[in-house]
């Protein structure tokens, strides 16, 4: 897998994780988390990284971790609309 593919996969994983969080979370909690954007709560970021199917070698790249976070925020923003 190339780095570019890992970035794309990370974004998709982030979206899936964000969608699952949004489904299970109360609306007020979601608004509070979105108000803190781009700072992601550390417990959610830890779950996102630990739950990733990507090899650790890719997770060490800033671009991949950024894509995970971006996917998460994209999913949360979609639920707000």
Identify the residue ranges that each predicted region occupies.
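Short, charged, intrinsically disordered terminal tails
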Residues: 66-81
């Amino acid at each position: 897998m190339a780095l570019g593919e890992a970035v794309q996969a990370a974004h998709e994983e982030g979206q899936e994780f964000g969608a699952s969080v949004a489904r299970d979370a109360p609306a007020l909690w979601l608004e509070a988390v979105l108000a803190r954007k781009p700072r992601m709560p550390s417990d959610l970021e830890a779950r996102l990284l630990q739950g990733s199917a990507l090899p650790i070698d890719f997770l060490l790249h800033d671009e991949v971790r950024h894509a995970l976070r971006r996917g998460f925020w994209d999913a949360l923003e979609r639920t707000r609309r």
